[in-house]
UniProtKB/Swiss-Prot annotation:
GO terms for cellular component: autophagosome membrane; cytoplasmic vesicle; cytosol; fungal-type vacuole membrane; lipid droplet; mitochondrial membrane; phagophore assembly site; vacuole-isolation membrane contact site. GO terms for biological process: autophagy of mitochondrion; cytoplasm to vacuole targeting by the Cvt pathway; endoplasmic reticulum to Golgi vesicle-mediated transport; lipid droplet formation; membrane fusion; piecemeal microautophagy of the nucleus; protein localization to phagophore assembly site; protein targeting to vacuole involved in autophagy. Residues 117-118 form a propeptide. It comes from Vanderwaltozyma polyspora (strain ATCC 22028 / DSM 70294 / BCRC 21397 / CBS 2163 / NBRC 10782 / NRRL Y-8283 / UCD 57-17) (Kluyveromyces polysporus). Ubiquitin-like modifier involved in autophagosome formation. With ATG4, mediates the delivery of the autophagosomes to the vacuole via the microtubule cytoskeleton. Required for selective autophagic degradation of the nucleus (nucleophagy) as well as for mitophagy which contributes to regulate mitochondrial quantity and quality by eliminating the mitochondria to a basal level to fulfill cellular energy requirements and preventing excess ROS production. Participates also in membrane fusion events that take place in the early secretory pathway. This is Autophagy-related protein 8. It is found in: Cytoplasmic vesicle, Autophagosome membrane; Vacuole membrane. The record marks G116, S117 as: Cleavage.
Length: 118
């Protein structure tokens, strides 16, 4: 999935920023979170996050749900490099495995109505 953050900022600028962030906040992870192109759930109000390294994927999903004010009947899925990370995985482990060359972890979220509408 193509990141609009990557297309807006040149590689060197992104790399410099992620290095500055990881030096200043050593136990935090720089994450870029963007909505999947064809998803029908709301756009997120900010896409750059500084996530505690001991946060689980499930806890991060909860943060995203709250930020986009997603109703309980809607499901949300997050993808890292087009794969669904395990809910119990630590964000630090996901970061180590999937971080981009620029130092950011790119997360895409998507949703679907799992319960249907009445």
């Amino acid at each position: 999935m193509k990141s609009s953050f990557k297309s807006e900022y040149p590689f060197e600028k992104r790399k410099t920023e992620s290095e500055r962030i990881t030096e200043k906040f050593q136990n935090r992870i720089p994450v870029i979170c963007e909505k999947a192109e064809k998803s029908d759930i709301p756009e997120i109000d900010k896409r750059k996050y500084l996530v505690p390294s001991d946060l689980t994927v499930g806890q991060f999903v909860y943060v995203i749900r709250k930020r986009i004010m997603l109703p309980p009947e809607k499901a949300i899925f997050i993808f890292v490099n087009d794969t669904l990370p395990p809910t119990a995985a630590l964000m630090s482990a996901v970061y180590q495995e999937h971080k981009d060359k620029d130092g950011f972890l790119y997360v895409t979220y998507s949703g679907e109505n799992t319960f249907g509408s009445l």
